[in-house]
From Swiss-Prot:
Its EC number is 2.1.1.192. This is Dual-specificity RNA methyltransferase RlmN. One of its GO terms (cellular component) is cytoplasm. It is an enzyme of class 2 (transferase). Belongs to the radical SAM superfamily. RlmN family. InterPro entries: Aldolase_TIM, Methyltransferase_A, RlmN_N, RNA_MTrfase_RlmN, rRNA_lsu_MTrfase_RlmN/Cfr, rSAM. It catalyses: adenosine(2503) in 23S rRNA + 2 reduced [2Fe-2S]-[ferredoxin] + 2 S-adenosyl-L-methionine = 2-methyladenosine(2503) in 23S rRNA + 5'-deoxyadenosine + L-methionine + 2 oxidized [2Fe-2S]-[ferredoxin] + S-adenosyl-L-homocysteine; adenosine(37) in tRNA + 2 reduced [2Fe-2S]-[ferredoxin] + 2 S-adenosyl-L-methionine = 2-methyladenosine(37) in tRNA + 5'-deoxyadenosine + L-methionine + 2 oxidized [2Fe-2S]-[ferredoxin] + S-adenosyl-L-homocysteine. Residues 95-330 form the Radical SAM core domain. Disulfide bonds join C102-C333. Keywords: 4Fe-4S, Cytoplasm, Disulfide bond, Iron, Iron-sulfur, Metal-binding, Methyltransferase, rRNA processing, S-adenosyl-L-methionine, Transferase, tRNA processing. One of its GO terms (molecular function) is tRNA binding.
Length: 360
């Protein structure tokens, strides 16, 4: 068992099994996540006998840093080896007064969004809680001495977090535990492409911030861009999102909308999007499309993006354009790929699809 898999509740269960008091969980949380201790022998306020028993039951294993890239804008991307020898990518984005860590939740992605490089890599497996919180642990260590620190976490790396809630929720609990990393729940954002059934379960287990990868204002277009929409259409997704913040005063949903030239960026799309969101407390984040090899889309012109923003604002919506960060190291939105042994044969199907289009 990996010690990083255990949040406070799991640690209490472990110590109960060992006949120990619940306060031991607090001790271990502080040693591991705040004092950065990786061996039980260094936990000096725990008896030698208990340390030995713990060592028999659990060990602390971290993802291995295979490579680090630093962008001209200060964005950092790490390639991390996880169990089984595959690799994921984690990105740190510095900004004035804040630092956002973008973590992955799967090796590859179980979904098949047509504009996302990660999706083209296929899918292998879910990450464990240890592999998710391990990204935070490693990033914290890598940033030591740089003057940068993690103030926010977004689950916007590789994978669909809501298809891995069993591992994501304990990781979130560790991030927000005052005896571990102590982030405010408002500073942690889980992004989903719209797995409605899991969104309802997420609402029962946490109240961190929610972002939704929307990308289209109607079902016909969203079916094409975000295929999971065929199973979880907008008439189910939008009410589920509204319900998530219904009992959370002063909270709002962030809607992610990638701008694709001639596809979803016309005036009528903006008006339709405003009608779709209605009076739900919202922020629309327009994302300039980040190209990748083989992509069949282009980014909307800047003038078109600004016009889209103005139309949304005319409807009373808060709308912003995301500043692209880390593009020179392929660390921007939709560009993370890692090293994935595809179990879905998605890459092979994509090649065959392109050959058919070219008439070969």
């Amino acid at each position: 068992m990996n010690l990083l898999d255990l949040d406070r509740q799991a640690l209490k269960r472990l110590f109960a099994d060992l006949g120990e008091k619940p306060f031991r969980a607090t001790q271990v949380l502080k040693w591991v996540h705040q004092r950065r201790v990786t061996g039980f022998e260094e936990m000096t306020d725990i008896s030698k006998a208990l340390r030995a028993r713990l060592a028999e039951r659990v060990a602390l294993r971290l993802p291995e840093v295979l490579a680090e890239q630093v962008s001209e804008d200060g964005t950092r991307k790490w390639l991390l080896r996880v169990d089984g020898g595959q690799a994921i990518e984690t990105v740190f984005i510095p900004d004035s007064g804040r630092g956002t860590l973008c973590v992955s939740s799967q090796v590859g992605c179980a979904l098949d969004c047509s504009f996302c490089s990660t999706a083209q890599q296929g899918f292998n497996r879910n990450l464990s809680t240890a592999e998710i919180i391990g990204q935070y642990y490693v990033a914290y260590d890598q940033l030591t001495g740089t003057g940068e620190q993690i103030t926010n976490v977004v689950f916007m790396g590789m994978g669909e977090p809501l298809l891995n809630l069993e591992a994501v929720i304990p990781a979130v609990r560790l991030m927000t535990d005052d005896d571990a990393y102590g982030l405010s729940k408002r500073k942690v954002t889980i992004s989903t492409s719209g797995v409605v059934t899991m969104l309802e379960r997420m609402r029962e287990q946490t109240d961190v911030s929610l972002a939704v990868s929307l990308h289209a204002p109607n079902n016909a277009l969203r079916d094409e861009l975000v295929p999971i929409n065929r199973k979880h259409p907008l008439e189910r997704l939008i009410p589920a999102c509204a319900a998530y913040i219904a009992d959370k005063p002063h909270r709002r949903i962030t809607w992610e909308y990638v701008m694709l030239d001639g596809v979803n960026d016309q005036d009528h799309h903006a008006h339709e999007l405003a009608r779709l969101l209605g009076d739900i407390p919202s922020k629309v984040n327009l994302i300039p499309f980040n190209p990748f090899p083989g992509a069949r889309y282009r980014c909307s012109p800047r003038g078109r993006i600004l016009r889209f923003v103005r139309i949304l604002q005319s409807h009373g919506l808060t709308a912003t354009t995301r500043v692209t960060r880390g593009q020179d190291i392929d660390g921007a939105c939709g560009q993370l790929v890692g090293k994935v042994q595809d179990r879905t044969r998605r890459q092979q199907r994509l090649v065959q699809r392109e050959l058919r289009r070219e008439g070969r």
